[in-house]
Amino acid sequence: MLKEYRTVKEVVGPLMLVDQVESVSFDELVEIELHNGEKRRGRVLEINKDKALVQLFEGSAGINIKGAKVKFLGKPLELGVSEDMLGRVFDGLGNPKDGGPKIIADEKRDISGIPINPVARNYPDEFIQTGVSAIDGLNTLVRGQKLPVFSGSGLPHAELAAQIARQAKVLKSDSKFAVVFAAIGTTFEEAQYFIDDFTKTGAIDRAVLFINLANDPAIERIATPRMALTAAEYLAFEKGMHVLVIMTDITNYCEALREVSAARKEVPGRRGYPGYLYTDLSTIYERAGRILGKEGSITQIPILTMPEDDKTHPIPDLTGYITEGQIILSRELYKKGIMPPIDVLPSLSRLKDKGIGKEKTREDHADTMNQLFAAYAQGKQAKELSVILGESALSDTDKLYAKFADAFEEEYVSQGFTTNRTIEETLNLGWKLLTILPKSELKRIRDEYLEKYLNKAEESK
């Protein structure tokens, strides 16, 4: 029989202090019954002798200290998981949000998950085709990788997230592909955009959506990504699926952490965020990967908005340390109408060389990727020089590089949010753009590939 406590001592923001408790453990699930019979949930955040600090998921509004009854349920916050979750929409705490029935769970899992033994990890080396040339061709996503998108306020990261979720697939694999989508602190319009896009395109049949709205309690945001990852782990490691987890917006998650930290009166770290922000983010990002002997995998694309477009802000800064690269959206490209506005030069996928090449994408992928990077960088330099000195100061070769940079942005990077390019189409487009430059400038591509692919590209112009 569970004990019922009427010893609530204090409620501050999203936190409740309960006195005279016995046999309570960290992270234990708590049920709070209000004086009017309403029930809310929370979890134990800290224990000090006979006092327990409880974090409230549904907020503290309307709680009367004298009339509240508290029960400690003896288990952590869990999610009931089943393959029937595919095609469904849930709120940030795993309750159905689409008007459908509750899921009949195959099992219940602690949302904190179990760390993957480093020795049991399998190395990511299989190409995932997103259909977006700037990612597939230049910053390749590999199965089991964690590759964040660094965006800015007002940039179209929601459209890019929906496009990747809709188009992504593992080539040359018979295993099922699923998408787990977590919207953290999004507006109603943005959440509805995702639901409508998934439903309209049929992508929802292979997707699980967790939606935490901006007007939902901030504390729910701390649970939402863990709910999504718990569902992903079940589908990947129990059902053998390749699971792509897209989480937007991690910045809102970190703001919720800061709110709890401030309520606990902890010593703040950089910009007021808690000193354990790095450790906390790692408990989310490190749940990506592959396990030896298991067919499935979890690939993560966390999306975050950089406050004031600042890459040195603690959230993108710490995310960059934990993850394996970053895709950066550019406000300059966005103003030019380049969609998606992916800035390929500062973007990076640290595992891209493991997922490309013969029998994965195509033999010429690495060489063309290096050449496109180099040519675009030189083209941007030439354009900057022409602004300062005038176009007449450029050599004929520099003018060609400037022309290449414009064509690269308009044709290669810009493809809209509905075009789904195969890796063959992306590579062939790269070769077509390289024909703008003299053959003598293509020094990063082997002669055998120049003979095989360059002539074809010139003929197709």
Swiss-Prot record:
Its keywords, alphabetically, are: ATP synthesis, Hydrogen ion transport, Ion transport, Transport
Q: Which Gene3D superfamilies match?
A: 3.40.50.12240
| One Gene Ontology biological process | proton motive force-driven plasma membrane ATP synthesis
- A GO molecular function held by the record: ATP binding
User: The organism sits in which domain of life?
Assistant: Bacteria
Pfam families listed in its UniProt record? ATP-synt_ab, ATP-synt_ab_N, ATP-synt_VA_C
Quote the InterPro entries the UniProt record gives: ATP-synt_VA_C, ATPase_a/bsu_AS, ATPase_F1/V1/A1_a/bsu_N, ATPase_F1/V1/A1_a/bsu_nucl-bd, P-loop_NTPase, V-ATPase_su_B/beta
Signal peptide feature range: none
* NCBIfam families in the cross-refs: PRK04196.1
| Family according to the record | Belongs to the ATPase alpha/beta chains family.
PANTHER family linked: V-TYPE PROTON ATPASE SUBUNIT B
What's its job? Produces ATP from ADP in the presence of a proton gradient across the membrane. The V-type beta chain is a regulatory subunit.
In its UniProt entry, what is this protein called?
V-type ATP synthase beta chain
Species this protein is from: Clostridium botulinum (strain Kyoto / Type A2)
